[in-house]
Structures are given as C-alpha cells and as structure tokens.
Amino acid sequence: MIEAAAQLYCVPEVEYTLQTYIVEGRQVLVATIEETPHKPVYAKDETGKPLAYLRIKDENILATPIHLRVWQQSDSPRGELIRYTEREQLLLDQLEHGTLLSLNRYCRQTGLSRRAAEHLLAKFVRYDIVEPVFENHKFYFRIKDE
C-alpha cells in the first residue's frame, strides 16, 4: 500500500525506506520519507486533483499559493531582479512593528491584487526578508529574525 501511494499518488514519486520491528510480539512497520530537495511534491486528493502539502510538527498542512510561488521561483535557473518601489516599501512598513500579517489583510490594506501580493511576498520569502509563520491553523508573515 505504501509503495502504491508513493508511485501512484505522488508527483514526483517519493522515495522511502521501510523497517520492520517486533514489539511485544507484534510486527511494526516504520516507513521513513526523507525531505525531498525538489519541491513541491503533489499528492492527489479523492478527486484526482494534485495538492502540495507542508509538514509542520507532525501535521500535513496544505501549501499556500505563496509556498508554491517560492518553490516555482527557486527552481528558475535564472535570477530575478527586485525593484524597490512603493509596493515593496509598503510591505516592509506593514511588517515593521513585528506584527503578523495575513495575505488577506495585506491585500485589503494595500489595495493590491491577490496575485501581485502573492508574488511580492514569495519574493521576500525566497530572499529571506520575510518568513511564513503557522499559527492557529493559518499562515501569517513577518520580518525574518536575523
């Protein structure tokens, strides 16, 4: 069953190791899946739709569009120039006081489209300026500690 899940439901296919232990006369199978350097790995849901997840404290959390953009940008072979405009300054101003900022609140307060906000946050996450924080089953963003 583990082999079928790794091959049929994961894109790209994930590698794993299996170990068997005998505990109190019962056989225990431990499957270990190491973190892959090539992200994201998509898992198909019940309808066949591919979804990407993050592993946080033994929980599988659905990846946000920002995570997907960070991974997409990281796989790009060429670099990307960041222009420092009012939009970038506005984001830094929003995060300046150490407050946690949600994507929705950022869009509302700045009037940016969701797509533009995702793109900008992904760039800042990719370059270690901003970090995602998972709190109360929701992602927020803050200036990354040095």
What is each model feature region?
Residues M1-E146:
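Conserved N-terminal catalytic/coupling substructures associated with nucleotide/phosphate chemistry
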